[in-house]
């Protein structure tokens, strides 16, 4: 999940940090390391958008690190819905005499980590369904001659969405008819992994998806192979 931490003492920010990458130091540890005078940590206030973890994973429990420093309080937006945390970090802090204030900017926190919460609560990925249609409910002309329904601003929004998601999925007919690249062009950010459902291997050999350098995963019923960053998965 995306987590940030700000440490405040006497009305001033003394440290801040965020979780930069999976398996890396958590936001709380990075914020603590950012504090120049560690003596100021005692009696301070920790502002965190997600409950500090309470278990040993790729890193030690953040709740234990906080307890050692004896802050006055910890203010959080959301409880961590991961079953191995799920309130245990909050309980551990309170059992060690640290005040915990919950649900500050709760809705904002839920929005920031909506992908994480969706997965933890349902076991399913967070999915955005995207299409463009005319006011009277049509997607394209029957002969396929139509082009853009969306405008420049809406297309820019789509590229923003692409930069925020790890993957984008289409069917083989869309790939062959529209010949999309499915990369990020009208926005700054990383390209998503492109995924095509092609059960009978009908994907055109000259499609942009096969000719560029981006990662492509093609799910089909016949072949299992890998050609550089083009992965064909039999399923």
Task: Give the location of each predicted region.
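Zn2+-dependent cytidine deaminase-like catalytic core
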Residues: 7, 12-108, 193
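Generic structural signal for helix capping and beta-alpha/helix-loop junctions
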Residues: 83-84, 110, 204, 225
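Short beta-strand scaffold segments in enzyme catalytic cores
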Residues: 2-11, 131-132
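Proteins enriched for Cys/Gly/acidic motifs involved in redox and nucleic-acid/cofactor modification
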Residues: 23-24, 90, 104-132
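Short, conserved clusters of charged catalytic residues that mark active-site
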Residues: 85, 108-112, 153-156, 177
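Active-site ligand-binding patch in enzyme domains
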Residues: 118-119, 124-235
